[in-house]
Regions:
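Post-signal peptide N-terminal segment of mature Sec-exported envelope proteins
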Residues: 28-49
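C-terminal motif of bacterial Sec signal peptides marking the signal peptidase cleavage site
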Residues: 14-17
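Short, well-ordered alpha-helical segments
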Residues: 127-152
Length: 155
């Protein structure tokens, strides 16, 4: 019994100071996006540009992006009367990056899918579509930032 207690105390003491530190996300975004070009859907391109172009003058890691946007809108569900009840939107991005600080370049792809309901009024349906596009765009921006931080920090 005493051996188990002593062993437990030793294990706790050794593991409690193992040096693990929670990574602060702000420290990972140590780059500056200086130029964003987009082709494809202009509305989504506008949303992506506005959310990505945060210039941090202090950082010396400057990145240029070229984003190709492919938007697919398809019917997801129909009811018994063959009326459309849900649409599905799929956003596919091909992001080409150019790192000015190391003359390195490459590409990565990101894809997000979501669906929205068809309402009785067209304006409500259009509003649902716009809200979904904004939400998917914000999710894509976060994924782009994560991928860029992994690339710039060699994670």
């Amino acid at each position: 019994m005493k051996k188990k207690l002593i062993f437990g105390v030793i294990v706790v003491l050794l593991l409690s100071s193992c040096g693990f530190k929670i990574v602060n996300n702000k420290e990972l975004y140590n780059y500056s996006i200086i130029d964003v070009k987009s082709s494809g859907d202009s509305k989504i391109g506008y949303l992506l540009k506005n959310n990505l172009q945060v210039k941090n003058e202090i950082q010396n890691k400057k990145i240029k992006l070229d984003i190709k946007i492919i938007k697919n809108k398809s019917i997801k569900e129909k009811n018994i009367k063959n009326q459309i009840t849900k649409y599905e939107i799929s956003l596919n991005l091909k992001v080409e990056y150019n790192l000015d600080f190391s003359n390195e370049s490459g590409t990565f792809s990101i894809s997000k899918t979501g669906s929205y309901d068809v309402e009785e009024k067209y304006s409500q349906t259009k509003n649902n579509e716009n809200n979904l596009i904004a939400e998917l765009s914000n999710n894509l921006v976060e994924e782009i930032k994560i991928n860029l931080s992994e690339i710039t920090n060699d994670l």
